[in-house]
């Protein structure tokens, strides 16, 4: 069997998947609403999960996704506390494999009327994305943040912590100590259109090389 259950450590409603393969976060804006809807339908048929990505949750993907993971990112564009309660899991993003330790750039050409409304941004203007969360700064604060998210969701859903492939041994240990149900390890092969080439090509470690120390 390929069934996987995630979140049995604390969550009242662990995430149950038929296959151990999921779709990582891709933002609304980089993808259209219909593409997000199609991914939701696909994962529902396959029995796995998809992830919101930057910019928040769209009604299309929530309506079609049996299992939807809500990403809580440092820059909080499109973050809606009510959507946290609609998610089947929450992923606190500390790092991204394609740009560990770095923020990003949301190009103005991606900011349509709808994207601008969801993210509370001016249309057509480039926006830099922060690399640090505004309300916590270290592992002790992360523990408090995870508890806050559990209270918001009434301890129902698993809390993931996503780390970049940089210091897998130490970062995994800190995430577990902070109370994460799942640690998501993102290696340098991950792609992004929202950072400099020097990050994409030269920073981070491959996923397979990170698994053993993690």
Task: List the predicted regions and their residue ranges.
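N-terminal capping/small domains of soluble enzymes
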Residues: 1-133, 141
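Glycine-rich phosphate/ribose-binding loops and adjacent secondary-structure elements
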Residues: 133-214
